[in-house]
């Protein structure tokens, strides 16, 4: 996997060996394998572990494991405790969203304070496929069908080339220890339902499902790039600004096909929804 990691990092222009990386280390198979590969490939990184205190003794077990791993491998480690339930209630958001906001807010602080170049997360090919189906079900449009991007600003995902199965097999072959999150097997969350119920069925129907979905996601990612370029070009032709006021050339818009989706793509960035755009076209 070392050569595949280095090839993926190079192909996607994620980072170089002189860059300082902050690696999100949960203690699970994905992040421990990524940390092991990064270490053995000679990349410079420190690790960051979030303790959300959502799973009682299991949360403390994870933190102890990560601390021991970092000490054994002489890797600088940052650990942060969070009152996730309190934050959730304060912000009136879901528990999942609360953990996400707390996690990335702290990561951004570390990057700014410690001078890291990139944040590396251990998302893999299965995560990307799950995200594709979640967005498909939610109706996010073409922008949501590219799965998880290898690079988003200074967030990089070097393990996207590998499936979960391959990661776990590598860990077992190398006797790499990791911890299991018991909530990953629960199917009350949409992502877990897709992982444990939908994907096994799709693999039974199409044994090459993992390879096929990965290729299709890559094609959709490239298609979206072309799509976005065309939208930007048309937006520049149809929108103008005078004294801080935006003007849309309706007559020119009406000559475009399909005008509905074009209008939505132009105006959605200003807070307009699909219903607003339909009202404009029917006025």
Give residue spans per PLM region.
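A general boundary/transition motif marking the beginning of the first structured unit of a protein
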Residues: 159, 186, 201-205, 219, ...
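Core alpha/beta nucleotide-donor-binding catalytic domains of modification enzymes
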Residues: 1-199, 229
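Short coil/turn linker and secondary-structure boundary residues
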Residues: 93-94, 140, 162, 189, ...
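Internal, active-site/partner-interface "lid" segment
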Residues: 184-189, 210-221
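Charged, solvent-exposed alpha-helical segments that act as regulatory interaction surfaces
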Residues: 142, 207, 211, 226-229
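AMP-forming adenylation/ATP pyrophosphatase catalytic core
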Residues: 2-30, 46-50, 82, 102, ...
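Conserved anion/nucleotide-ligand pocket segment
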Residues: 195-213
């Amino acid at each position: 996997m070392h050569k595949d990691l280095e090839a993926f990092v190079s192909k996607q222009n994620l980072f170089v060996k002189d860059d300082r990386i902050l690696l999100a280390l949960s203690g699970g198979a994905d992040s421990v394998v990524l940390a092991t590969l990064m270490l053995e490939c000679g990349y410079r990184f420190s690790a960051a572990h979030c303790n959300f205190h959502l799973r009682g003794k299991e949360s403390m077990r994870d933190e102890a494991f990560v601390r021991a791993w970092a000490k054994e491998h002489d890797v600088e480690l940052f650990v942060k405790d969070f009152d996730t339930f309190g934050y959730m209630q304060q912000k009136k958001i879901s528990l999942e969203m609360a953990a996400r906001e707390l996690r990335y807010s702290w990561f951004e602080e570390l990057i700014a304070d410690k001078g890291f170049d990139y944040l590396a997360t251990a998302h893999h090919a299965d995560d990307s496929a799950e995200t594709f189906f979640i967005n498909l079900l939610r109706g996010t449009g073409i922008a949501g069908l590219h799965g998880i991007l290898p690079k988003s600003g200074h967030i990089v995902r070097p393990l996207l080339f590998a499936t979960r199965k391959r990661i776990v097999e590598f860990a077992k072959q190398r006797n790499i220890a990791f911890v299991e999150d018991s909530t990953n097997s629960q199917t009350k969350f949409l992502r877990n339902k897709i992982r444990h119920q939908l994907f096994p069925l799709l693999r039974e129907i199409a044994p090459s499902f993992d390879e096929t979905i990965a290729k299709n996601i890559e094609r959709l990612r490239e298609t979206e790039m072309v799509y976005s370029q065309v939208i930007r070009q048309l937006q520049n032709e149809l929108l103008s600004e005078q004294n801080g006021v935006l003007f849309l050339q309706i007559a020119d818009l009406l000559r475009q096909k399909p005008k509905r989706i074009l209008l939505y793509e132009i105006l959605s960035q200003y807070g307009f929804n699909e219903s607003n755009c339909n009202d404009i076209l029917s006025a």
